């Protein structure tokens, strides 16, 4: 009886996955010559190149910026404030992408916070924030906290005995960093990179809003344009399959090298990093944690500030907002229940 139930559930969810593909293939007409011409088109080449380029840069910058932040947090992970920061690092899963877009404009735009106080546009000879600069900033703000959480996860899996041995052998700070902590980060670096690369490669709202024109269009945006405006489902589906293939390729290679670790076990009350009490290390860690926390969580801070300062909360109590809120609540709760049961 148990196995019959399992097969029934598997069959049901298999249908849910396969039926959309049946609908997709019913819309496409395969013509090898047209497919060949489409992939030989210079516009298609530019779409593929820019999609890979912006995703690669975004993922690389997010990962490299996350490493010093994760290392600083790991050295003081027994503090309650660090646990709170680590919890906040998962906000990329719950914050709407459009809020990141608004935050980039409010903070880095022509009339934004940084330009108003530091006159960045004139000092750095910047004409506009829109384009590759805005896309990279938005992806960094969205994905660096996520990368920090994953790298912290890797560091958190280092056995306490390793630190005790390191301390007893009087290994230097850089020796400890290069021989113990960096290898643990390195073993999952490409996995984290591949996840963030896929997220940036599939990015839609950020590229659509901050791209600034067709020059900075990606495959995801082109699929939307072909399907909605040109009603050319052949091109949209071809690009979709190309996108799926590229993402699966990176994810397969990334997860092939994945090493397991303790994702939620942050509590190590007796944890004492061998070098955390050094005055210079304390100052550097403090500056890193404060700077990265302010910069990476600036979208949340910006949204809350404008929400309260402009009295937006007063306009939310209306029929339209409440209807949208309850629709979202019903969909999310129902989806959560179905996924949990399955």
Model-derived regions: residue spans:
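Membrane-water interface segments at the C-terminal ends of transmembrane alpha-helices
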Residues: 2-31, 42-156, 184-211, 238-255, ...
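A short amphipathic helical element positioned immediately N-terminal to and/or at the very start
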Residues: 32-40, 177-178, 311-317
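Short helix-to-coil transition segments within interhelical loops
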Residues: 158-185, 229, 317
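Solenoid-repeat scaffolds in large eukaryotic assemblies
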Residues: 166, 235-236
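Outer-membrane beta-barrel domain signature
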Residues: 167, 246-266
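Glycine-rich helix-loop "coupling/hinge" segments at transmembrane-helix boundaries
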Residues: 205-231
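Flexible interhelical linker loops that connect adjacent transmembrane helices
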Residues: 257-288
């Amino acid at each position: 009886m148990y196995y019959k139930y399992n097969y029934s559930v598997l069959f049901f969810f298999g249908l849910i996955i396969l039926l959309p593909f049946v609908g997709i293939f019913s819309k496409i007409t395969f013509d090898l010559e047209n497919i060949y011409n489409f992939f030989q088109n210079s516009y298609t080449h530019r779409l593929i190149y820019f999609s890979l380029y912006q995703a690669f840069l975004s993922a690389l910058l997010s990962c490299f910026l996350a490493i010093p932040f994760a290392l600083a947090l790991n050295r003081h992970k027994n503090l309650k404030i660090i646990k709170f920061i680590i919890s906040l690092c998962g906000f990329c899963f719950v914050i709407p992408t459009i809020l990141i877009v608004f935050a980039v404009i409010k903070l880095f735009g022509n009339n934004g916070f940084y330009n108003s106080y530091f006159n960045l546009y004139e000092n750095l000879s910047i004409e506009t924030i829109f384009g590759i600069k805005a896309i990279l900033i938005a992806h960094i703000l969205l994905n660096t906290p996520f990368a920090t959480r994953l790298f912290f996860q890797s560091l958190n899996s280092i056995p306490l005995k390793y630190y005790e041995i390191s301390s007893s052998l009087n290994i230097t700070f850089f020796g400890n960093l290069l021989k113990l902590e960096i290898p643990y980060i390195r073993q999952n670096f490409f996995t984290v990179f591949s996840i963030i690369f896929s997220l940036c490669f599939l990015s839609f709202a950020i590229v659509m809003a901050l791209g600034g024109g067709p020059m900075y269009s990606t495959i995801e945006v082109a699929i939307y344009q072909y399907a909605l405006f040109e009603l050319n489902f052949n091109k949209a589906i071809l690009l979709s399959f190309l996108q799926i293939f590229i993402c699966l390729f990176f994810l397969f290679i990334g997860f092939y090298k994945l090493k397991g670790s303790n994702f939620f076990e942050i509590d190590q009350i007796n944890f004492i990093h061998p070098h955390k009490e050094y005055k210079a290390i304390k100052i550097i860690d403090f500056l890193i944690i404060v700077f990265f926390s302010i910069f990476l969580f600036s979208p949340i801070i910006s949204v809350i500030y404008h929400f309260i300062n402009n009295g937006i909360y007063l306009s939310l109590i209306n029929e339209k907002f409440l209807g949208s809120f309850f629709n979202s609540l019903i969909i999310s709760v129902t989806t959560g229940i179905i996924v949990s049961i399955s």
